[in-house]
Amino acid sequence: MELLPLWLCLGFHFLTVEWRHRSGMVTAASQGGCELLDGVADCRGRNLASVPSDLPPSSRTLLLDANPLRTLGNNSLQRYPFLESLSLHDCYLERIGHVAFQEQARLRSLALPDNALSESYKETAAALHGLRGLRMLDLSGNSLTEDMAALMLQNLSSLESVSLARNIIMRLDESVFEGLGHLRELDLQRNYIFEIEGGAFDGLTQLRHLNLAYNNLPCLVDFSLTQLRSLNVSYNVLEWFLASGGEAAFELETLDLSHNQLLFFPLLPQCSKLHTLLLRDNNMGFYRDLYNTSSPQEMVAQFLLVDGNVTNITTVNLWEEFASSDLSSLRFLDMSQNQFQYLPDGFLKKMPSLSHLNLKQNCLVTLHIREHEPPGALVELDLSQNQLSELHLAPGLPGCLRSLQSFNLSSNQLLGVPAGLFANARNLATVDMSHNQISLCPLPASLDPGGTPGCVDFRNVASLQSLSLEDCGLEALQDCSFQGTALTHLDLSGNWGVLNGSIAPLWDVAPTLQVLSLRNVGLTSSFTELDFSAFENLRSLDLSGNALTSFPRFGGSLALQTLDLRRNLLTALPQRAVSEQLAGSLRTIYLSQNPYDCCGVEDWGALQRLHIVADLAMVTCNLSSKVIRLTELPAGVPQVCKWERVDMGLLYLVLILPSCLTLLVACTITFLTFRKPLLQVIKSRCHWSSIY
């Protein structure tokens, strides 16, 4: 007992020391309002007016983004000589002291985007010139001109990555990037560049990635950056792209010319490693078959290139611009949103490695599938939103789509496809033929691939998983329409009467279907077989836009997660038993735009508690010719509904019968009371003389 006070004192002492130690750790972790972790000081958005002076001197990364610093003084960073990365994004910087980075010999990355460095660019340039080891510099969003940028980049020969995006640069010449022999990545997007003088990039022998998107370049002629691997010139006003002639080997792998005004297919290098070519949203077309080109002189264009005192003339064959281009390594080609009316002979044959071809939203009317076209490596082909009325398959090519996995033919004018087009398509998983007026073949189509039958046959395409036939004007399906397939996604929306009173045509794919869309197909509750119990793997079911008056039937182990019943004729919500069954798996249900009776929503509370009604605020019901939101339904509605359920004829009879009986009794009493006087009055009034 005598030792107890001693133990208590020692325990209190150790607890005090531990509390102080932990408090010190917490303070260190958030010193000066900044978060510290493994040499990184995160001071972003702290409303700091100057660089904190109480951070660990050994900090390697300092993040000061979104602070109103305005000025970076000469001594602001003197305490942090080990900095390797400094970020000053959106700090309202107008001035950087000329020796602000004097102690930062280890600095490798400097981010200064979205400031106002153009205000004192000369002093800023002087400060940057001391960073001999800098590798990454971000000057985007500083309202810099080309002269300002040239001064700031002067003598920074160690730079490997530079961003000058979102400035006001208009012209580029050899002086802007002079001495940047190690530069590998240059971002010039979102400027006002309309001219690039010859030799502007000649000194950038290590340049691999160049971004010129969102500028005002009218053309790129005599392109000769052989060392470049990716070039982005999207969102300009390019009308021509011509690589330099000769057999020089280009390292170019990705070329983005999308969203320009190109009229002709670009003249690409004769020897390159190009694997991605993006030509979306231009005005391109092939013209050889559209004009009378009997004279060779009518088929060429000459470009006069003036560079100082040197004049070069480049002659281009307008009708065969792709003939000399090296497309052997091309894997991804996007030609969507152009004016292509046809593909010339041999065009696709030059691309044996092509795996993705996008020809969406062009003017194609007829497509001839010839030998080795499409290439055997083709995985995805998009021909949607054209004017295709015919597909021609060369004889002897029934398995030309053997590698194809996705085939999009939607929004065309097709009535059918060549017989055998899908034969031996062992990998075909997705087909979209929506918005074509096609019909499904009642019997296997003819094996003659020469013509185009007026139907399409998907049977026995074992690899097919997703099929879209929306708004195809399909007639009633036969029971074997999808026999031999393992569909997981099926869209039959917009085909009124396609099921003809029964979902039996879908039984072949019922065990595998996961997503089924039957929107606007004319379903009614009078269907004798509108029972989805056999669809045990169904995850999503769309029954909107039909004429259902009651809930469809579900049974067995239900896996349904999404159910859409909008725009039907439902007057009552599902019964409690159905709601409890759906609650096990259902995550989302749509119930709005139905003429519900407010007296038929007794189970609304139970359904609401499940929190699965996605359009809860839009569900309404009718009560005494009024439309009321279910969420605003008053508490007294059940009493009103009890009165509305009473037979009104019986009610009127009960109200009128006592009144009639009372009136009859009153009349009888009156008659009996005044019977004798009344008879005398009648006799006196009706008395007349007799002739006798």
From Swiss-Prot:
- The protein here is known as Transforming growth factor beta activator LRRC33
Q: Which residues form the signal peptide?
A: 1-19
Spell out the family assignment given in the record's similarity comment: Belongs to the LRRC32/LRRC33 family.
A single GO BP: inflammatory response
What are the UniProt keywords, alphabetically? Cell membrane, Disulfide bond, Endoplasmic reticulum, Glycoprotein, Growth factor binding, Leucine-rich repeat, Membrane, Repeat, Signal, Transmembrane, Transmembrane helix
Annotated organism of origin: Bos taurus (Bovine)
Provide the LRRCT domain boundaries.
606-643
Q: What is the lineage of its organism?
A: Eukaryota, Metazoa, Chordata, Craniata, Vertebrata
Q: Which Gene3D superfamilies match?
A: Ribonuclease Inhibitor
Ranges occupied by LRR repeats: 58-79, 82-103, 106-127, 133-155, 158-179, 182-203, 206-227, 228-248, 251-272, 273-294, 329-350, 353-374, 377-398, 403-424, 427-447, 463-484, 486-495, 512-534, 537-558, 559-580, 585-605
Q: Please name the gene that encodes this protein.
A: NRROS
Glyco sites are at N74, N155, N232, N292, N309, N312, N408, N500, N622
* Described purpose of this protein according to its UniProt entry: Key regulator of transforming growth factor beta-1 (TGFB1) specifically required for microglia function in the nervous system. Required for activation of latent TGF-beta-1 in macrophages and microglia: associates specifically via disulfide bonds with the Latency-associated peptide (LAP), which is the regulatory chain of TGFB1, and regulates integrin-dependent activation of TGF-beta-1.
